[in-house]
Each structure stands twice: as C-alpha cells, then as structure tokens.
C-alpha cells in the first residue's frame, strides 16, 4: 500500500549563518508546501542536509516537522546512516514522534555487500516493526547499489519494508526490481 500518491517534496533544512537550523524559516517552508497541495513531506533526506546535521539537530528537525505538519500530509523522515545502530536509534526516535514512514539510505562510503544490505535493512525494520520503511537507493552519492534481487527479497520477507526511492536512473534495473518484487514494493522516483 502506498504511503502517499502524488508529489512528495524533499524539504531543505534552512540554516542561519552560524550553521544552526532556522526553525522559523522551516515552518514557513512547510506551510507553503502544504498550502500548495504537496502530497507528502520528506524531511532530513539528501536535500535536507541530513549528513551535515548533528544527531540532535537531525532528530529535532524531524520532531519539529512532524509536530508542525500535524497529520495534514504524511511525513517521511530520513533516518538512514552508514552505521546500523545509529540508523536504528534515529528510526526509533522518529517513529516515536509519529513519522508516517522512514527513508533509509544505503550505508555509504564502505560499500556494503548485498548480504550486508539485507542485514542492515532487516535490523532497522525489525527495530520499528509498525513503521513503514522506504529504502533509498542513490549509488551516485553512496557508492552502494541495491540490486533488484536484494530489493525484492527485502520487500517480500520484511513486512514493513514497503518501498524504494530509486535514484539510479537505470530503467532496466528498475523494471527488473519491480518485476521481481511482484507487487510487494512501491516505487518512488527521486
């Protein structure tokens, strides 16, 4: 089942000159998106500077967004990390705040194997069993590609892995992935 249909907007995280999050401006951005019929908000993804925020800022930004959006549209929180335990901690927190789904980027820099990806995503999903997870496949940024068979395996075997944000641009890979997943995986482009 789709978490949303239509357009999910990856929100920037506005900052002051000193590098602190500008929550007043973030609220303006959120209100503008909702007023203009955005179907879902994606917070703390690549566009949201997730890799440059401290864990505290990251979680504060997610909580602020969930509170301000207040269920008017789904909020998908980016909680991925190259460290499985960090991703679990961030995911549990975001789930406790009421995130509608979690966006989990592949581990970056260390180039996980497909077996490693299965272990990583399964551990995170098992830590937040009631919260839908969307895998985020952006190998141009992470150096790690979720292969079609891996995505299909996870979708079929881990109940709350429900989708993939597929950013490879490889249409043959995407077609194969969706075929292997046999209707068990929602596809989000990005």
Where are these regions (language model features)?
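Catalytic alpha/beta core domains of metabolic enzymes, predominantly
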Residues: 125-128, 141-190
